[in-house]
Amino acid sequence: MSSEFFIPDPEGQVPTAEGYFGAFGGKFIPEALVAAVDEVAVEYDKAKADPEFARELDDLLVHYTGRPSALTEVSRFAEHAGGARVFLKREDLNHTGSHKINNVLGQALLTRRMGKTRVIAETGAGQHGVATATACALFGLDCTIYMGEIDTQRQALNVARMRMLGAEVIAVKSGSRTLKDAINEAFRDWVANVDRTHYLFGTVAGPHPFPAMVRDFHRVIGVEARRQILERAGRLPDAAVACVGGGSNAIGLFHAFIPDTGVRLIGCEPAGHGLETGEHAATLTAGEPGILHGSRSYVLQDDEGQITEPYSISAGLDYPGIGPEHAYLKDSGRGEYRAVTDDAAMQALRLLSRTEGIIPAIESAHALAGALEIGKELGKDGLILVNLSGRGDKDMDTAARYFGLYDTDASVAADADSDIAEIEGDAK
């Protein structure tokens, strides 16, 4: 199969036929879901071998999504990163505003191939929910989105977008009322309605085949970026950097660079209020191997093996697990993972906005914060590629409250402007 954008199963790279990435992955699900998950695996294998599937997906990615996404050098931002050159892979410019549409269109096509008429999905920041609702509108599929009640409040704009697109949005009020609980409810729905429903899983976690399938639909990010940075900079980057929650945007960027051992693959996890506070979602930094949502990976858990509640200012990173391929990359030493606090991410968000006129999603801002530190380590000869996984429209209320940007917070806003002036002065 020849395809410019859909390039599954790179030769010689994991997973195994059983869905394992080293010791991680697999399929740990209730009996009621075995047939449905196996059907997804079988149909996906057929789709990978079907040139028409690749042709249709390529057409959607070009003419509907707007691929290839741009590669933007951010020179003023880079002045604060030790003078290293910094390039952004602009997934924020995709239709719906993030990388999520890549995977959603692929799975929507698969849903149609399976003859299913209804799609369910989980969402944290709302970007996967918006992308899913968009694809369902395009394909004429019924759509139900599960979203933690806390996330519906801090991402109210995306809730409105989903409903405008025709989706039913169900606020999950159990547990921590965030992404983990939305996934739990979506799995319950799938068990009850498996005959006509496909669970359009939004990240590279879950039972096999979802980690590999979602990765394959996102590989286009790294394939494009690798070609683009060679054209723009004349060489491969020293580091490819992405935020990590479940891990889909990061693995999409990383995968094309795995054979390039001179390229460091660096994921930036949410450290929340700080690792020492316990209020974070830094799974690879502070977690232990365990089973969550159908696969074995690193999980945030207590001494008795119970899942602990994650925290992040970013709704899209607020997850106590991680995709099994990231666990494999960590343990093999091929991937590096750092924890970034809320404060560091928000400062990076503001810095990119003020120096480049690009407002990133809070999720992506974690990667930007990481890039600032990595650039200082690499120095002026360094070259950094950052995946800007989404735009920040959805986060404006959070950012405005954090920085005091509303008129009622004028004194706080003045302090924020003063801080930026001081930062810019330090860089000169």
Swiss-Prot record:
InterPro entries with a match to the protein in the record: Trp_synth_b_CS (IPR006653), Trp_synth_beta (IPR006654), Trp_synth_beta/beta-like (IPR023026), TrpB-like_PALP (IPR001926), TrpB-like_PALP_sf (IPR036052)
What name does this protein carry?
Tryptophan synthase beta chain
Q: What does this protein do?
A: The beta subunit is responsible for the synthesis of L-tryptophan from indole and L-serine.
Q: How does it assemble?
A: Tetramer of two alpha and two beta chains.
GN (gene name): trpB
Output the Pfam families linked to this UniProt entry: PALP
Family (UniProt): Belongs to the TrpB family.
User: In the UniProt record, does the keyword Ribonucleoprotein occur?
Assistant: no
Q: In which pathway does it act?
A: Amino-acid biosynthesis; L-tryptophan biosynthesis; L-tryptophan from chorismate: step 5/5
The GO terms describing molecular function are: tryptophan synthase activity
Which prosthetic group or cofactor does it need? pyridoxal 5'-phosphate
**Top-level EC class as recorded in UniProt:** lyase
GO terms for CC? cytoplasm
